[in-house]
Amino acid sequence: MDALTVAPVPPGRVKLPDRRHAVVIGSGFGGLAAAIRLGARGYRVTVLERLGAPGGRAAVHRQDGFTFDAGPTIITAPYLLEELWTLCGRRMADDVELRRIDPFYRIRFDDGTVFNATADYDAMRAEVARIEPDDVPGFERFIRESKRIYEVAFHQLGDQPFHKVATLLRAAPDLLRLGGHRTVYAKVSKYFRNETLRIAFSFHPLLIGGNPFTTTAYFCLVGHLERLHGVHYAMGGTGAIVAGLVRLIEDQGGTLRLNAEVEQITVENGRATGLRLAGGERIAADIVVSNADVAWTYTKLLSEHKRRRWTDRRLARARYSMGLVVWYFGTNRRFEDVYQHTMVLGPRYEGLLQDIFHRKVLTPDFSMYLHRPSANDPSLAPPGCDAFYVLAPVPNLASGTDWSTEAEPYRQRMQQRLEETVMPGLGECIVTSRMLTPQNFRDRLLSVNGAAFSLEPQLFQSAWFRPHNISEEVEGLFLVGAGTHPGAGVPGVVSSARVLDQVVPDPAMLRATAR
């Protein structure tokens, strides 16, 4: 990705009443980043959030003295966030403290084997050698290959708009040369023979809603991204970043409206002219940016507009990411042996993922990601206590699972598994608890099929094949977030806002819809 090309707006310009109006639907990371970038370019910005607090998937839950991040817990490529502060003439470090976490995470396999992923090349090499000495040469080659993929697929193309076929054709030779037609697991298997190591180096697509056995090998870049930029935690939780971004928008002169549910994007002569809220209020806009779920945007917010490409039928047939069961809980004692980021894997890998993504059946076995933020940030729990967040990938709602009856039995199985592996005695010390299931993702976040990461990142749902950042259906409508290019994850959704710099017209060149 190239350096910044957008200059900060001089403070004297932020209150001009005749600036062109940009309305952003949704206040997830993508929407907040888009709002800041539009404000920096001279737009008057309004952000509309249907819920009572900003953040979207990055909202915050507080109960019984504990603070839980609802969604993202890992910050990689922090420079993408730092750019937003730079655009406003500020330093991110003055508002948010990022703490580097290394090792990144600890992977516990079903047989008790532990693998520590780290930025330290020699330490990582030693981890590989400890598990399978014969795979060390393959590890060294894979590290070099991961870097090459990163430099093309993320550094060069991650913030480039892919709404033109010509862009895809120019990129295709490099992407094919790097094995983009293969899957992540197939790519990793070229370098590692040991199945434990194949799992350790191929699971990353799950962090963005993908199946390692179907996700394009471009996503082998994630490992290099982590090593290059580090894995970080925001002190106070990811919600501290959300709060900082909201302050930037307000300091630019922008507005965040909560409990403002958008019912329809209004269109005249093929151009977006504003929005109609659920209560009937109409808001005029020169451009509209949707950070809502991309399928929801097209099927619900543009239901009154005839669409050529992203029709209801096409979106119904698209492949969506898996769902998640997320259990937040607090304990009245600390579990000092539990690392901040821990993967607790079950007995199956490929078979489990086939059940989740393709067969769409809920199975007795599962794998979990356990987050213990209070390991480094005791402010998130009362004294002597610990805050936890554990999630398990599950089929999305296309499975027909009734989570109103399945949620509690599933939570109990998660608790039992934690007690058997890394948290003995857990059941005796839980003092607060809450859950999210795919039904919550559907009903609260308006995510189609309750998918946790919108569209699944398969080859033919990536880059040009993904819904574009500039809408093909309506002039003046732009998309950011997990369902558009480049995809899910904090770096992906923040980069989707970066793409807008190249596709949103300069406000001075835009014919007025509203003042």
What are these regions (language model features)?
Residues 1-23, 40-41, 458-465, 471, ...:
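Extreme N-terminal leader/targeting segments of oxidoreductases
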Residues 2, 263-382:
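Mid-domain catalytic core of redox enzymes
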Residues 13-151:
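N-terminal glycine-rich phosphate/pyrophosphate-binding loop and immediately adjacent elements
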Residues 72, 482-505:
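A conserved FAD-binding loop/helix module that cradles the flavin
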Residues 108-214:
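Rossmann-like flavin
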Residues 194-208, 363-371, 424-486:
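A glycine-rich dinucleotide-binding beta-alpha-beta segment and adjacent secondary-structure elements
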Residues 221-278:
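Helical element adjacent to the flavin cofactor pocket in flavoenzyme catalytic cores
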Residues 332-442:
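C-terminal segments that line or cap access tunnels to active or ligand-binding sites in enzymes
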